[in-house]
Amino acid sequence: MTVLTIEEMAATLAPGQAIAGLDLGTKTIGLSMSDLGRRFATPRPVIRRAKFTIDAQALLDFAAKERVAGFVIGLPMNMDGSAGPRVQATRAFVRNMEEKTALPFVYWDERLSTVAAERTLLEMDVSRAKRAERIDSAAASFILQGALDRLSLLARSDGDEFSA
């Protein structure tokens, strides 16, 4: 497993490979998947957190089933840009995954992704109970969509035939 920049991931992905977005919480791991063209992020059901070995296996099972080529994981920076305790927990999770998979990870600044996801669910008139169930995967979609938009921009600047 390798931690890459988004630019490095862009260089390693083959056309038609999907990537997954992760929003690592204390109780759940929010999941989202890109389409094969890597244009759209779609929320997927969360993984309920237990202990690391169980969480890791559930994530690896998801990755195998969905043929994931890499992960974009939200890095919960403080608003001032400093790293808080959740950043440390996220980095520790990725370090621990190093022993479990060769799939690459990209850290993505997730500031305000949960706020944006909550606002979107409110605008869709989703009930409070349903919002609680869906917020982490919606946040994972916001994280992944940001990375997909960056990948699209990189592809256009490189003259890639698959760019929008």
From Swiss-Prot:
One of its GO terms (molecular function) is nuclease activity. GO terms for cellular component: cytosol. SMART domains: YqgFc (SM00732). It is found in: Cytoplasm. CDD domains: YqgF. It comes from the Bacteria. The keyword Hydrolase applies. It is an enzyme of class 3 (hydrolase). Belongs to the YqgF nuclease family. Could be a nuclease involved in processing of the 5'-end of pre-16S rRNA. This is Putative pre-16S rRNA nuclease. It comes from Rhizobium etli (strain CIAT 652).
